[in-house]
Curated annotation (Swiss-Prot):
Detected in petals and sepals, and at lower levels in bracts and red stems. Catalyzes the transfer of a malonyl group from malonyl-CoA to the 6'''-hydroxyl group of the 5-glucosyl moiety of anthocyanins. Active towards bisdemalonylsalvianin (pelargonidin 3-O-(6-caffeoyl-beta-D-glucoside) 5-O-beta-D-glucoside) and shisonin, but not towards nodemalonylsalvianin, salvianin, pelargonidin 3,5-diglucoside and delphinidin 3,5-diglucoside. Completely inhibited by 10 mM p-coumaric acid, this inhibition is rapid, reversible and non-competitive. Completely inhibited by 0.1 mM Cu(2+), 0.1 mM Hg(2+) and 10 mM caffeic acid. Partially inhibited by 5 mM N-ethylmaleimide, 1 mM diethylpyrocarbonate and 1 mM acetyl-CoA. Changing residue 150 to A: Activity reduced to 67% of wild-type. This is Malonyl-coenzyme:anthocyanin 5-O-glucoside-6'''-O-malonyltransferase.
Length: 462
């Protein structure tokens, strides 16, 4: 059957009329993402409904709750302002009349297949993302959309909420906070329940960039580099020439992996190291001395001095890079080596207040040094669980992070939707590369679990 997605409506949802204008300068945490591709995510919900119910009840309620959520998250409805005169500085701005572009659609694609964990063609998911708004011009500024939504009905089966955001808007904690607030307002408790649950000011977002201590003007250092890079309209990486698969690590798997590390390891370290070593073992091993890099992101809120509040909305991500020779990761004890390298970076830098921002002025040049090297990154975190965003339909059935389609290579990481304490790893790779990874993943998890390992069928991409 030919699958199609039909656009039923396009509209713009503003916050309530009383909203005040707001301008936010980009911190050095924000501005480094200026030319980064949009972050694209899909949330699938099992919520059978008819087209009539969808259009006349569900969609109007989602629009209303989105508008109310924007009351507390004004930047989401705004734009990124990029100066035509690069002596000025980019900023986020909400002005009266700004809004979130929303697309309403219907799909006859196979909902069960899309929400599965088996190998699926990556291109088909892009029908569920909102169109990319063009860059607009205003006086001395270029206006770039920073958030867009598409709500797609699968009649009688479920709903997909697809959204894309410019990374300058905020990191995972911030975006998950907004989506969760939208869901909470849309749910059973409504706006009154949301206000009651968030009566403490510390539970609502703050946008004050004065919390970011930048005495060395790192923001200006980054802008001096980034303003020389041509501004381009975002595009979808189609055709991707990739497939997507989800790999499950149950809690028992993670605990057994922890026992195989040389030093005590967290669940994140165990999962990340395992995937990293499997990627290397299943990839090109022609040069054993070549460096393999793993980028470890961490939320700096509460880790820096003075601390940045947890309800700070924006970017606050610090990254560290674990580096190991390819041959060592491809060896039999490659997982333990990977865990030691990742754990060492976390303990030595990311958990050390004196080290976490050391050399921050060199972040841009450090990024450029990684170009052309073999790198694995991470998108998402079980700590900021989008699957729990409940619009009144229960937790999401599946999260797909489409952003990783445009990277070589990155893994998505989230809590398991089916097994308490488990983790789901999402990958986007060429088909043959995915098959090679799957084979190594299966063999390695069985070896780590020992002879009492459960049925091999459970270690396939689920």
């Amino acid at each position: 059957m030919t699958t199609t997605t039909t656009i039923l409506e396009t509209c713009h949802i503003p916050p309530p009329p009383a909203a005040n204008d707001l301008s936010i300068p980009l911190s050095f945490f924000d501005i480094k993402w200026l030319h980064y591709h949009p972050v694209r995510r899909l949330l699938f919900y099992h919520h059978p409904s008819s087209k009539s119910q969808f259009l006349h009840t569900i969609v109007p309620h989602l629009k209303q709750s989105l508008s109310l959520a924007l009351t507390h998250y004004l930047p989401v409805a705004g734009n990124l302002l990029y100066p035509s005169n690069t002596e000025k500085f980019p900023q986020l701005r909400y002005a009266a009349g700004d809004s979130v572009p929303v697309t309403i659609a219907e799909s006859n694609s196979d909902f069960e297949s899309l929400t599965g964990n088996h190998t699926r063609d990556a291109d088909q998911f892009y029908d569920l993302l909102p169109p990319i708004p063009p860059i607009e011009e205003e006086s001395d500024w270029k206006l770039i959309n920073i958030f867009a939504v598409q709500i797609t009905l699968f009649p009688g089966e479920g709903i997909c909420i697809g959204f894309s955001n410019h990374h300058c808007l905020g990191d995972a904690r911030s975006i998950v906070g907004f989506i969760s607030a939208w869901g909470e307002i849309n749910g059973i408790g409504g706006y009154e329940g949301f206000l009651s649950n968030h009566s403490d000011s510390l539970s609502l977002p703050i946008f004050d960039r004065s919390f970011i201590n930048d005495p060395n003007k790192i923001d200006a250092i980054f802008w001096k580099v980034l303003r020389n890079i041509p501004l381009k309209t975002a595009s979808f990486p189609l055709p991707t020439n990739r497939v997507r698969s989800t790999f499950l690590l149950r809690r028992s798997d993670i605990e057994k992996l922890k026992t195989a590390t040389k030093s005590p390891a967290s669940s994140f370290v165990a999962a990340a190291a395992f995937v990293w070593s499997c990627m290397v073992k299943s990839g090109d091993k022609s040069d054993e001395n070549a460096p393999e890099l793993f980028i470890i992101p961490a939320d700096a809120r509460g880790r820096v001095d003075p601390p940045i509040p947890e309800n700070y909305f924006g970017n606050c991500i610090v990254s560290s890079v674990a580096q190991v020779e390819r041959g060592k990761l491809a060896a039999e004890d490659g997982f333990a080596v990977a865990a030691e390298a990742i754990g060492g970076e976390i303990e030595g830098k990311l958990k050390n207040r004196d080290e976490i921002l050391r050399g921050a002025e060199n972040w841009m040049s450090d990024i450029f040094k990684c170009f052309g090297m073999s790198v694995l990154g991470v998108s998402g975190s079980p700590k900021f669980d989008l699957l729990k965003a409940d619009f009144g339909w229960g937790k999401a059935r599946k999260l797909e992070v489409l952003s990783i389609d445009g990277e070589n290579h990155s893994m998505s990481l989230c809590s398991s939707s089916d097994f308490n304490g488990g983790l789901e790893v999402g990958l986007s790779l060429p088909r043959e590369r995915m098959a090679a990874f799957e084979e190594v993943f299966r063999a390695s998890i069985m070896a780590a679990s020992g002879p009492a390992r459960r049925s091999p069928a459970l270690v396939e991409p689920l």
